[in-house]
Structures are given as C-alpha cells and as structure tokens.
Amino acid sequence: MTIVDIAKEAGYSVSTVSRVLNGRRDVSEEARDRIMRIVEAYQFVPNNNAKHLKQTVSQSILILVKGTSNMLFTNIIEVIQDTIEGSDYSLRVHYLDEDADEVKEAVRMCREHKPMGILFLGGNIQYFHEEFELVNVPCVLVTDRADKLGFRNLASVSTDDMAAAEMAVDYLFDHGHRDIAVIGGDMALSSPSKYRKAGAKRSFIKHGCEFEEESYAVARFSYESAYNAMNRMLASKRSITAVFAMSDVMAVGAMRAIFD
C-alpha cells in the first residue's frame, strides 16, 4: 500500500492525501475522514525514504522538550501555541527524558515527519557537536548558546546563566548567609547547570568563602529528585541556612523537603 493506492481508493488526489498525512488544515473534513479511515484500515505508515514518494516538508513546527517538569518550558509552549493559532502551521510537541540525546531524536523526526523547523527547549551542547549536521531544517536552541557551533541552520536564545546564578547567590550572601547549599543538574548532561554552578562558585569566591563540592547536590530537574536531594543534604547534618536551586521545580521540591 502506497500513498498513490490510498489516493485511488479514497477518490482524491495524491496531494490531498499528502496534506492529510502532514496534518494540514486546508482539507475538508469529509476528505480527511475518508482518507484516515483507509489509512487506519490498512495500517498505512508513510515511507518517507521511498524514492517514488514526493519529498515534501510539512507545515508542522517540532518542539523537542528535555524533561517534563520545567515550568518555564510549559509557558513557552503556551505562548507559541497562541502565536500560531489560526495560521497554516501546526505544532508537534515531543517530550524527551533529560538524559536523552535530543539531536539523535531530531534526526529521526526529520526523517519520519519532515517538520519545517525545530525548537529545542533544553539540551546538551555536546550532542550538537556530534550529529547536528544531519539535521537539515532551521532550528532554534533555547537555554544555551549556539553561535560558536558554526551551523548556519542553528540559532539560539538564552540567558546568561552564569551571571544570573551569581546574582542569586549574591542575594543570599547579602542577607547574611554563609552556609549555602546548591541543588542543580548533572554537569555531564546539562550545559546550563555548568554555567549556573560556575556562577555560584564565583559568588562564593567574591564573598571570601570556599565552594565545597559537598555543598552541591546533583538532582534531575524534577520535584521528586530535588526533594530527595534536599533530604540527603539535610541528613548530612551540615549547618545549611540557605539553598540556591537551579530551577523553579527544584526549588519547590527542596522547600517541601525542608518543611517536612
């Protein structure tokens, strides 16, 4: 069964079938329903690599989200949905575990779904060094800088994680705290965590304090993981008076552990 066979049985053109399979809105409900009934009946899966199929780019924008507990990413997705509402574009949101390789997933999604562009919400910059040349659509990386990678199809939007972390820890020092714990991500998996930890260290040094590795608790960017990390820190009997958490959800988890 090919897309041509689907078109013949449905009584519509190949281009109409293609628009339905790509999630386009410019198709009547009658045509969409008939075509999808046939697709489901034959359990048809488009073969995007077959030479006889026309290679098309869908009108979908792919968002690859690292982790499922980031409140900031949820807000960003809502704004994007509001922005494209009523346009010819559709949004495909795909969640990944924070340990996953988002670039490998982007390569797979490009091959199977042919999005017109990709937005990476979170990521490990190391993965972009390795396989990003296989991604051939415009992309934007959020939360890390891509300007030094040298890819013409990759732009980025990010904050200065190091400066922001330094300011946050400065605030704690300015309010009299000296025994400060830090809860953040795994350095090997999270590029922003590296910069935020460096910013925290810079603040410690500026205020004449040594940053001890025992002050840093590694956690996933989730409520439960931060909760457990804070409990481990409390169980260590350290005289902690303040905590710098590297994300909102981590802060909530740490607060819950303290209150418990």
Please give the residue ranges for each predicted region.
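Hydrophobic alpha-helical segments within soluble ligand-binding/sensing domains
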Residues: A155-V182, A198-R202, Y223-M233, A251
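Short beta-strand segments enriched in small/hydrophobic residues
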Residues: T16-R19, L53-S69, Y171, D179-M187
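Short, surface-exposed alpha-helical segments at coil->helix boundaries
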Residues: R32, T74-E78, E166, S193-K201
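Alpha-helical recognition/docking segments in bacterial nutrient-uptake
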Residues: T56-D170, D174, A235, S239
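Residue-level recognition of beta-strand->loop/alpha-helix junctions
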Residues: Y95-D97, G184, S215-V218
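Hydrophobic alpha-helical
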Residues: I118, G123-E130, K194-D260
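N-terminal helix-turn-helix DNA-binding module of bacterial transcription factors
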Residues: M1-V57
